[in-house]
Structure formats: structure tokens, C-alpha cells
Regions:
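Glycosyltransferase donor-sugar binding loop
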Residues: 24-27, 170, 174, 197-210, ...
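Short N-terminal targeting/anchoring amphipathic segment
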Residues: 51-71, 84-85
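Active-site proximal beta-strand in glycosyltransferases
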Residues: 76-95, 120
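Nucleotide-sugar donor phosphate/pyrophosphate-binding loop at the beta->alpha transition
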Residues: 91-115, 120, 149-151
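Donor nucleotide-sugar binding/catalytic pocket of nucleotide-sugar-dependent glycosyltransferases
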Residues: 114-162, 166
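Conserved donor-binding/catalytic core segment of Leloir-type glycosyltransferases
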Residues: 156-188, 199
């Protein structure tokens, strides 16, 4: 919800308030600590357990389904006149041959070819991943996150204010996001005699490993700073001042 609030606000108004956002589960503690989820109470937000929302789901026209229980997604998808799924890439860790048959049957069971469903791709790789299983070909659309749009008086002034040798990395410290590549980039820049500063925003399972690598390279605090978790608003301020994001 936190990534799609502006879009949800717009859909709520465009449909004359005939839009609802159904949350299957509460936001996890990690994201709440980042400041996400604050001020998200909206007249169109419901919990999946609410009886009122069950009535709306039984009389829907369009369904956009993300990380929702598959049994209920199938049930409501049959009732919808227009059915979209949205997804990030599904093969983040590759597609080993031994896992292919199981994945093929699972995703075809979730998305039978005779059901007219469309895919909203929240990654540049989503369409290609599903195409490997013969799914959603010709029925994929670009999708993404929808943060608030801020109109700056002058983009040129904003660029001029940026710190020229500052690099910002923001995300969860997970293996498939490869934050360790940033440490390697820093090491190469340092060896080349470059003057630079890298700020890393986020938390995750690789945090201690990354700090250790930065320390072993002699770059911790001097060239690389770990800023921890912060709210989306604070992240935007850092992005406004960084030369490279």
C-alpha cells in the first residue's frame, strides 16, 4: 500500500469512490521501522477479514491481485470482468532445470491459459520470466511503484546543489540485490585515487557482512557510511542531495 498510495488515491476519485484496497496481512515490523505505513488510513482500505469487503469482492468489475492468497485470488478472478495480476520477477535466483517442471505446473495451475488474465510487470524481467513458462505472452504491461510526484521549481538548481562525488545506494541488504557490489565499486574507486563518498540506506541480513567488508578495505566511515533504516521522506532528501543514486 505504501508504494501505491498516490495511485490508490487517484483510482478512488476516478471511480467515484468505487475502489477498495484490501490488505491480506499487516505490514511487517521492518517496514514499519522504515516509516512506511504512517498516515495510510484511507476510506478505501480494508482488511481481508472485514465482512464489508467480502460483499464488495463478490460484486467487483476489475480485480488487480498482488500477494493475496491464491485460492481467493482465483475465486474473485472468476467473478471479475477484467483480471490483472501484478508481480515482480519470479526467477530472482535463476531457473534450475530440476525445478522447471514443478514451477511449470504450479504457475499454469494458477494461470490456466483459457482464463483471460493480464500481467502488470513490476520489474523489467517479469514478462521474460513468465514467458519461459508460456504465460502472459502479449498480455504484459509496464507497472511499478507510484511515489508522490514533486514538482521542483528548477531542475537545474536541484542538479547544481547535488554533492558531485556522492553516491547513494538504497534498498534491503539481501543477496539477490547485490549490495556487496557497492563495496567492490568503492574499493576500485579508492585504488584509482578517486575522491568520493558512498551512503548506504537500508537494513537486512547482509548488513554486518557489508560493514565488515568496508572495514577490511579501510573504507568504513571514511568513504562508506551506513545510515540504517529511514522513512521514504528522508530517503528522498538524501536522493535530492546525492550526485549518483
Amino acid at each position: 500500500m505504501y508504494k501505491r498510495q498516490p495511485l490508490s488515491d487517484a483510482l478512488y476519485e476516478l471511480t467515484d469512490h468505487n475502489y477498495c484496497f484490501v490488505a491480506h496481512k499487516e505490514m511487517d515490523a521492518e517496514r514499519k521501522n522504515l516509516g512506511w505505513g504512517n498516515d495510510l488510513a484511507r476510506p478505501y482500505t480494508y482488511s481481508a477479514a472485514d465482512q464489508e469487503v467480502q460483499m464488495q469482492l463478490n460484486d467487483l468489475d476489475v480485480l488487480i491481485a498482488g500477494s493475496f492468497p491464491e485460492r481467493q485470488t482465483k475465486e474473485y478472478g472468476k467473478k471479475a470482468k477484467l483480471f490483472f495480476r501484478y508481480s515482480e520477477r519470479i526467477l530472482k535466483t535463476g531457473n534450475p532445470l530440476l525445478k522447471y517442471p514443478k514451477r511449470f505446473f504450479h504457475w499454469h495451475a494458477c494461470n490456466p491459459p483459457w482464463r483471460k488474465a493480464y500481467m502488470l510487470c513490476a520489474s523489467a524481467y517479469t514478462a521474460g520470466d513468465y514467458a519461459k513458462f508460456g504465460l502472459f505472452r502479449g498480455r504484459c504491461y509496464k507497472w511499478g511503484y507510484f511515489p508522490e510526484t514533486i514538482r521542483y521549481p528548477s531542475i537545474d538548481d536541484l542538479i547544481d546543489r547535488k554533492a558531485k562525488a556522492t553516491i547513494l545506494w538504497c534498498g534491503r541488504f539481501l543477496g539477490w540485490k547485490h549490495p556487496d557490489d557497492v563495496i567492490e565499486v568503492a574499493r576500485r574507486l579508492h585504488d584509482a585515487g578517486c575522491c568520493f563518498k558512498i551512503e548506504m540506506i537500508g537494513t537486512g541480513e547482509m548488513e554486518q557482512q557489508l560493514k565488515r567488508q568496508a572495514s577490511e578495505a579501510g573504507l568504513l566511515e571514511t568513504n562508506i557510511r551506513f545510515l540504517g533504516a529511514m522513512s521514504p521522506e528522508a530517503v528522498r532528501l538524501h536522493m535530492e542531495s546525492a550526485g549518483i543514486c
